């Protein structure tokens, strides 16, 4: 069981927090705050700028091309062909990017395309599988993977960046600290790289939808003094001066 923390915060105190973060802690949609938000993240497109520049200069691909799902896949197609042409061996092009979370792509992508895949209300879940929406999601995810424009081999896509398998990946904003500073091209050779963090690509012509994910803290039942002390700590921890320091060091959103 978790304590309802809502009575321990004034309306003024609640207004200082992002409304969506507090709403996520209202597990039963009844106004109770059972999970106190402390660590929230979204998704970004991370790019190995150092190795992207030669490709961009040769093909004319720009950061703007990477702002949409379709543009990113077209750039990935060009990157595959560009790397394939650098050797005599056929069909040995490289993948440009990968994704850490398929679920986020499906949920946010469907929402951008006008379909809410599922809703949950009063303990009942409603599923919606709109065929045109799912077809577009398929064409812009699985098809590029099959063609070799996108890839996933390590546990996380930042692992693939480190060994040079990818130049970019879509992942959590909290993964910024894991982006490698060098690429290992062999057991004995490596070179330094610089990172760029770009907005997560959205479907062309659609209102962008960004995932909000993360963790919170709960307070278990205890004495009134114990509960009040826990709430005092959570308020202190999420004060701007403390929260900003935590956000900078962890990659989570303020």
What do the predicted segments below correspond to?
Residues 67-71, 150-163:
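Short helix-initiation/N-cap motifs at beta->coil->alpha
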């Amino acid at each position: 069981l978790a304590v309802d923390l809502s009575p321990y915060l004034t309306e003024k105190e609640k207004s200082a927090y992002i409304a969506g973060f507090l709403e996520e802690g209202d597990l039963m949609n009844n106004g109770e705050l059972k999970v106190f938000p402390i660590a929230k993240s979204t998704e970004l497109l991370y790019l190995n700028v150092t190795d992207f520049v030669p490709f961009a200069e040769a093909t004319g691909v720009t950061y703007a091309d990477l702002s949409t799902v379709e543009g990113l896949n077209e750039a990935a197609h060009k990157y595959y062909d560009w790397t394939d042409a650098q050797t005599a061996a056929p069909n040995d092009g490289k993948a440009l990017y990968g994704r850490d979370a398929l679920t986020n792509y499906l949920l946010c992508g469907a929402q951008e395309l006008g379909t809410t895949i599922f809703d949950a209300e009063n303990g009942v879940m409603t599923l919606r599988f709109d065929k045109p929406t799912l077809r577009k999601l398929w064409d812009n995810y699985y098809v590029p993977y099959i063609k070799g424009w996108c890839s996933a081999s390590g546990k996380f896509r930042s692992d693939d960046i480190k060994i040079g398998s990818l130049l970019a990946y879509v992942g959590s904003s909290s993964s910024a600290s894991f982006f490698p500073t060098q690429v290992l091209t062999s057991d004995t050779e490596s070179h330094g790289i610089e990172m760029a963090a770009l907005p997560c690509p959205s479907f062309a012509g659609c209102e962008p939808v960004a995932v909000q994910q993360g963790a919170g803290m709960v307070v278990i039942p205890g004495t009134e003094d114990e509960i009040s002390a826990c709430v005092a700590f959570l308020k202190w921890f999420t004060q701007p001066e403390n929260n900003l320091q935590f956000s900078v060091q962890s990659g989570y959103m303020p």
